[in-house]
């Protein structure tokens, strides 16, 4: 069901999970929708197999990417909190080449695709969504779309914030279904910053009911940021239901 490959001319390590993978050939037997997913800082693409398994059982493939400096392209310096926006910038710039390889594979031909991520990975997803794209929906977890809320953190780089902050580029955002899951007591990524962004999306949307934010807490997760603790199963179910609705049902 899964295999590890290199995409984007070999620069981006990816874990591909496909519900119809032929074990003998290593190829998919029929195309299905796909979620392009990016993890958070200091972890790897293999972190959350439960997510990929649930989606595969629902008929959705996953393409999980290692962020720059992480996993198979480990670089301790790039995991420094002060370089978070550099990592986000590089990852957002690599997504198109990843998509080109996914398209060339034929494993998702004629199917919808989604993008999402956790924390820094979610930030990269939102940056990419402020440029022309063909994603049908997006989902992020413990991430932030209004970066002014991180001004006192080491990651805050005024030049990169001006260039990439999704809240400052709402005019370039295409109106698609969007789900944000968050921990209300998140110590690293304030829920208020994501709520401000989601509220702005809803205010601009012709279909505001398709844009939702759900907060948990207290969860017991480390720093109320690394996952959803006692609510992990509920978060997985919400995410899966959202993707099934917009990738498979297409409502």
Label every model-predicted segment.
Residues 43-44, 70, 146, 221:
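Active-site loop signature of alpha/beta-hydrolase-fold enzymes
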Residues 206-251:
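C-terminal catalytic histidine-bearing segment of alpha/beta-hydrolase fold enzymes
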Residues 148-206:
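The feature captures the conserved acid-bearing segment of alpha/beta-hydrolase catalytic domains
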Residues 1-30:
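N-terminal cap/lid segment of alpha/beta-hydrolase-fold proteins
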Residues 97-158:
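Primarily recognizes the serine-hydrolase "nucleophile elbow" in alpha/beta-hydrolase
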Residues 55-76:
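Conserved alpha/beta-hydrolase
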Residues 20-58, 62:
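Short, surface-exposed "cap/lid" segments of acyl-processing enzymes
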Residues 82-106:
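Alpha/beta-hydrolase active-site loop
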């Amino acid at each position: 069901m899964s295999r590890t490959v290199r995409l984007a001319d070999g620069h981006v390590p990816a874990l591909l999970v496909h519900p119809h993978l032929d074990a003998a050939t290593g190829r998919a037997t029929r195309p299905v929708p796909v979620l392009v997913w990016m993890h958070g800082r200091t972890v790897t693409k293999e972190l959350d197999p439960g997510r990929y398994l649930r989606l595969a059982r629902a008929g959705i493939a996953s393409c999980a990417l290692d962020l720059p400096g992480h996993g198979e392209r480990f670089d301790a310096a790039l995991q420094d909190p002060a370089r978070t926006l550099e990592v986000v910038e590089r990852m957002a710039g690599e997504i198109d080449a990843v998509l080109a390889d996914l398209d060339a594979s034929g494993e998702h031909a004629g199917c919808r695709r989604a993008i999402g991520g956790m924390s820094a990975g979610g930030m990269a997803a939102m940056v990419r969504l402020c440029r022309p794209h063909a994603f049908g929906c997006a989902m992020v977890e413990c991430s932030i779309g209004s970066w002014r809320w991180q001004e006192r953190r080491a990651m805050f780089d005024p030049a990169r914030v001006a260039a990439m902050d999704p809240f400052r580029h709402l005019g370039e955002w295409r109106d698609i279904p969007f789900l944000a899951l968050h921990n209300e007591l998140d110590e690293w990524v304030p829920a208020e910053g994501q709520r401000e962004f989601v509220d702005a999306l809803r205010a601009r949307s012709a279909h505001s009911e398709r844009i939702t934010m759900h907060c948990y807490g207290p969860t017991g997760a480390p720093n109320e940021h690394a996952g959803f603790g006692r609510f992990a199963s509920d978060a997985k179910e919400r995410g899966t239901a959202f993707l099934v609705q917009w990738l498979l049902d297409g409502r």
